[in-house]
Amino acid sequence: MKRAPVRPRSREALLLFFPNPMKPYFLFLAAAALTLSGARAQEGAVTFEAKAGPGKGKHVVFLGGDEEYRGEECLPVLAKILSDKHGFKTSVCFATGKDGTVDPNVNTTLSGSAALDSADAIVILLRWRQWEDVAMARFDKAFKAGKPVIALRTSTHAFKFPDSSPWKSYNKFGKNVVGEDWVSHWGNHKVEATRGVIEPAHATHPVLRGVTDVFGDTDVYEAYPPADAAILLRGQVLKGMAPSDPPAVYSKKRATDQVEQDVNTPMMPVAWVRDFKQESGVTNKVFTTTMGSATDFASEDLRRLVVNGVYWSLGMDVPAKADVGTSGTFTPSKYGFDGAKKGLKPADFAPGTGK
């Protein structure tokens, strides 16, 4: 029996599969760009596969969702440092809108939350989130399993669920676990920057290895960590927004007890570590810094402090001076509400994509 010749598909038939004939080409280019940047997008998270390094076999998951401090920009940078320079697999999850673009003003979503199922440590830059049950259940499971928590800036007030929510106990996650809740802007917001000053009593703590010069253009938060916390850095309030500015000199009242003190005597803590013991007996290692805008992470030693915090939280030897070089030029956006870049997908924030 003679086989009928195969007729070439008509243009109309091809258009059923590819309405835009160039679309496969552009999809290929997009995939190639992600591969070249060392990232891949999977189920809404951006994942950086591990290169050689001591972190090989460990997965660090970054959770972003703050309206002001451009966590969507700095978390991928930190994640790529850990994967490229230290051998950790890292994933970054974002707050996204209905169209899948990154939108930190949406406080109910966490793209790629499945990454939490294999997390060995969790880095958070969150502010008053009310995640959906699926994402919250994954976070709850990882936290209750004792996964370490590295908390940045507004993560002192990470969650804000209504009283009717089964997750409302997480509204105290800042005070109970991170080590402080939201209290106040101790320095004048957007007017007085922060210089990190090492706490002499813990100057030899491994998280401070190689850390000598921390500066951030965010202000100092008022904070009173619990007695079991080891304070690593205090925040000197500066007179202006430049690293060369002198310390501020004036008095103000503390929000907690209305007692007046010099703004820098004593200085407020801006970084600490602690062990949080759950009622189940499980213990989480916790590293917290109330610094942490994208612009703050222009400071090499602040990046090093956080990388060291990841090592310490996982019980690993902290390098003498961790490599925290960024991929290409890191030009973070200035912090502020409604300042997030519009129309970008999670993969667009991977360093090296040029977005």
Task: Cite the ranges covered by each PLM segment.
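Glycine-rich, highly charged phosphate/nucleotide-binding loops
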Residues: 99-114
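Glycine- and acidic-residue-enriched helix-capping/strand-helix junction motifs
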Residues: 65-80
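Bacterial N-terminal signal peptides
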Residues: 27-37
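Extracellular ligand-binding/catalytic regions of CAZymes and related secreted enzymes
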Residues: 42-55, 74, 84-85, 241, ...
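A short beta-strand-loop structural module common to alpha/beta enzyme folds
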Residues: 88-101
